[in-house]
Amino acid sequence: MRSQPHVLSIVLAGGEGKRLFPFTADRAKPAVPFGGSYRLIDFVLSNLVNAGYMKVCVLTQYKSHSLDRHISQSWQLSGLAGEYITPVPAQQRLGKRWFTGSADAILQSLNLIYDEDPEYIIVFGADHVYRMDPEQMVKEHIESGAACSVAGIRVPRKEATAFGCIQADDDGTITEFLEKPADPPATPDDPDVTFASMGNYVFTTQALIDALKEDSEDENSAHDMGGNIIPYFVNRGEAHVHDFSRNVVPGETDRDHGYWRDVGTVDAFYEAHMDLISVYPVFNLYNRKWPIHTSDDSNLPPAKFVKGGIAQSSIVAAGCIISAGTVRNSVLGPGVVVEEGASVEGCVLMDGVRIGKGAVVRHAILDKNVRVGDNALIGVDRARDSERFTLSQGGVVCVPKNYELHGADED
């Protein structure tokens, strides 16, 4: 393992994820399945572990059972070596109240910092799809002498109005942090792009503690990391931007270098899946030099295709059975069954979905354990779909967890 300063990683995983409804109706956003075999939180945890950061606290709150279980079952490290990835629910250490913001979540968890006594603290979000080497950011943070570093991704200025935007000088010192500005600032070296905050931070420990305590005394604060804590450091001239375009991950290609996606809406979530199944995806799941880790599916049998069942341009996870059915341009999670004569096209099917004989499912996302009856139709009649399900702005049909759709002959 590479020699490193003493670092504690904190992952903020308490988000409700309302824009991903109905897939967050029963789980926290970081626990939403992604890419057939993963959960959203697997990406940030993989980045930390691949970089050698093995002391990780995941702060949870909203409907966290699924997330807690996934972390406990899939991310067991060697306690003998002092390594851990542990979910930490709201402890109510500062009174009988829940987290009121991301900064308050860390404030209420200061005991974790005091117990570990790190030199530096990584604070990352839990619900983005990307590869990143956090060690490079920590090293740059130390060399900069700043108290706070913010990872910034270069985006076209005309598209940056939906982000927290960073204005920095030539040496990377952040001079202004603007939340969703109408006129985003340009980067020092390119007038057509701006630095958008990725929600990933590195702090010198005592500086973060001081900022959190001062923020807690401000009755007008939203106690938010991006909205309050980062501006605190910017105003003091103590914030530095880490240019994500310079973060190089082993095994990456020119095509997927710098890939980062906020999949916080249904349409963004769907489009990220459709990228995965393209011939040359922008994001490569198959980079073995910087793998995305998740639960071990070795207890599931391999996917099986029988009676002429086929899958084209698709990702099919372990335990799936395609029996005389057809799957095209889709992502199937573990244990999905597609029966005789059924057609699945342009879909994301999560764990345990069953598609009945002769059913047609198109342009849809089906949550875990959905049952689609024989000859039933989804994504064929928009008016009918809108009566039964949620439709995204882009027209993606969203079928909630455990839903049972009767077959055509049962209506």
UniProtKB/Swiss-Prot annotation:
Protein name as catalogued: Glucose-1-phosphate adenylyltransferase
Protein's organism: Corynebacterium kroppenstedtii (strain DSM 44385 / JCM 11950 / CIP 105744 / CCUG 35717)
GO MF term list: ATP binding; glucose-1-phosphate adenylyltransferase activity
Pathway(s) the chain acts in: Glycan biosynthesis; glycogen biosynthesis
Record: residues binding alpha-D-glucose 1-phosphate: 164, 179-180, 197
CDD domains on file: ADP_Glucose_PP (cd02508), LbH_G1P_AT_C (cd04651)
SUPFAM superfamilies associated with the record: Nucleotide-diphospho-sugar transferases, Trimeric LpxA-like enzymes
Keyword Transferase assigned: yes
